[in-house]
Amino acid sequence: MKGVGIDLPQQDFIDMKDAGIEVISTEWGMEQRVGMARAFLDQAQSAGLKVIMDGGFSSRAWGFTDSDWQRLPEGKRPVWQKERVQGWINALKDHPAIYAWDISNEFGENLPSGAGAGCPDWPNSRITIEQLKQARADVLEADPTRPIHARMYGGDKGEFPDHVKAMLDNKIADIISLNLYSNYLANNKLQWPTVIADAGAFFVNAIKKRQPEVKVWMSISAFEYPKQFQRTTAASLERDIDEAVKIQELDGVSFFCWGPVDQWDMKSDWYLPKSGPDLWTVIKNKIKN
């Protein structure tokens, strides 16, 4: 389960575990206090859950400040913060609930220098492959015991863009979360509601062809974000899950998101148990069956 908020009751963790969820991840990271992060990890550990933690996907890991979201200085680009990242990892790595370290969300598209923030320099302000190679090396230097996780999305059905090919060829990640959200909107229209049925297997197989040993988890939409993502329906969620599990090369399925998400690039009061109880029921039933 992705996008799990930092300040939740223990029952949420218990409910996820009881439903069959094994691993959770967050949208928050190094902007939070270490004490808060450890408390979250304690909750997960108590419920028997593992956590994918920020190891470099957050804006702080790339040298950005809160004010950059409101007004990015002209020409400011991502700069990897080795000391900050390794300090964060060293403060948390002894916790047994940590499953992996997440070093990238869509090549920085969701950073202040990214397309999601309306940066006019995009895609020139994209995180580079050399930076991701350095990020991987530095995270593994601090904690060589856990795998590296990265997030990416599929484009049009066809060749991957060069930066995605380079990520796979350089084995940046040990686990890839492939974000295929069928509820994506543009101009108030769903753009590709059948993306998983149409191209899910293609994307997974293309990833495995370039990096055979990588684990691929498909991330499926179970949320709403006004003007960008239409509320997932129970029917579309059932369809997406059914199509995903047909893909033989797929190693796992995840869902975005539990919520709430309160980050600079995405503020949402979406909270799956209350905002999408019908979707949570679908997820639980599908895992059970």
Question: Where on the chain are the PLM-derived regions?
Answer:
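Active-site mouth loops of central-metabolism enzymes
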Residues: 1-8, 69-79, 149-150, 154-155, ...
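Surface-exposed, active-site-proximal loop segments in enzymatic domains
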Residues: 59-79, 109-120, 266-271
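Substrate-binding cleft of secreted/luminal carbohydrate-active enzymes
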Residues: 99, 215-288
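Aromatic-lined carbohydrate-recognition surfaces of secreted/lumenal glycan-active proteins
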Residues: 54-56, 100-102, 125-164, 178, ...
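Glycoside hydrolase catalytic-domain groove-lining segments
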Residues: 12, 147, 156-228, 271-279, ...
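Active-site groove signature of glycoside hydrolases
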Residues: 72, 82-126, 171, 178-180, ...
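Short, acidic/polar
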Residues: 4-18, 80-91, 156-169, 232-245
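Aromatic-lined substrate-binding rim segments of carbohydrate-active enzymes
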Residues: 9-69, 120-150, 168-169, 190-205, ...
